[in-house]
């Protein structure tokens, strides 16, 4: 399978390495984040993988969709445009799979957090909060993974109604608010944790990334799955769709 990479930064280089190490796929082309991209830029490709920045992704999206080559997106920071992007994908007849984090380990972690949030929901003495740490070069704050975890907690636990992630506030956090704390520190790859507390217990569900290989390998696997899915049913997909089908 031939991959075109949009973005040649740290994650782009990791995806390149994962493709070359697969023995199954090849890199068709690598496009820099500031390259002028058109529909023809993806001719001959089977899958596009985008690890750029929010603004570049949104500018390049129409050309990627017009090419009808399925797109795997790891670029974060465009959550507010999610409904617009989903509509664009559906109208184009192409396919796009988005995940804030393609690490299979992180996605196991997210599902564990969701289940823990569901299990404590009936017990009002249990509270839950979420935190994350990343390197100081990371642009979005909180991380896309943290926001996805927060959404999953709200879906699983009806006692939490909204997310609060401000750096400071002049009031206490209400019981129905889910606090999401973010720290930017040095060169930390990525740490996420859900903290659960009651009068008698402290429970911590956590994940620490040791390197970027897990993110890159998951993106390549998701691309292979999406290319097949595109021939059957084009549309907008997430990592949950991929895992649900793979895990049965």
UniProtKB/Swiss-Prot annotation:
UniProt keyword annotation of Chloroplast present: no
Protein's pathway: Amino-acid biosynthesis; L-lysine biosynthesis via DAP pathway; (S)-tetrahydrodipicolinate from L-aspartate: step 4/4
Cellular component annotations (GO), alphabetically ordered: cytosol
Binding, (S)-2,3,4,5-tetrahydrodipicolinate: 135, 144-145
Catalysis performed (reactions): (S)-2,3,4,5-tetrahydrodipicolinate + NAD(+) + H2O = (2S,4S)-4-hydroxy-2,3,4,5-tetrahydrodipicolinate + NADH + H(+); (S)-2,3,4,5-tetrahydrodipicolinate + NADP(+) + H2O = (2S,4S)-4-hydroxy-2,3,4,5-tetrahydrodipicolinate + NADPH + H(+)
Pfam families listed in its UniProt record: DapB_C, DapB_N
Gene3D superfamilies named in the record: Dihydrodipicolinate Reductase, domain 2, NAD(P)-binding Rossmann-like Domain
EC number per UniProt: 1.17.1.8
Binding-site list for NAD(+): 74-76, 99-102
BP GO annotations: diaminopimelate biosynthetic process; lysine biosynthetic process via diaminopimelate
Residue positions of the active site: 134 (proton donor/acceptor), 138 (proton donor)
A GO molecular-function descriptor: NADP binding
Top-level division of the source organism's lineage: Bacteria
InterPro entries, A to Z: DapB_C, DapB_N, DHDPR_bac, NAD(P)-bd_dom_sf
Localisation: Cytoplasm
Entry keywords, A to Z: Amino-acid biosynthesis, Cytoplasm, Diaminopimelate biosynthesis, Lysine biosynthesis, NAD, NADP, Oxidoreductase
Role noted for this protein: Catalyzes the conversion of 4-hydroxy-tetrahydrodipicolinate (HTPA) to tetrahydrodipicolinate.
NCBIfam families (alphabetical): dapB
Family, per entry: Belongs to the DapB family.
Name of the protein this chain belongs to: 4-hydroxy-tetrahydrodipicolinate reductase
Organism: Chlorobium phaeobacteroides (strain BS1)
Taxonomy of the source species: Bacteria, Pseudomonadati, Chlorobiota, Chlorobiia, Chlorobiales
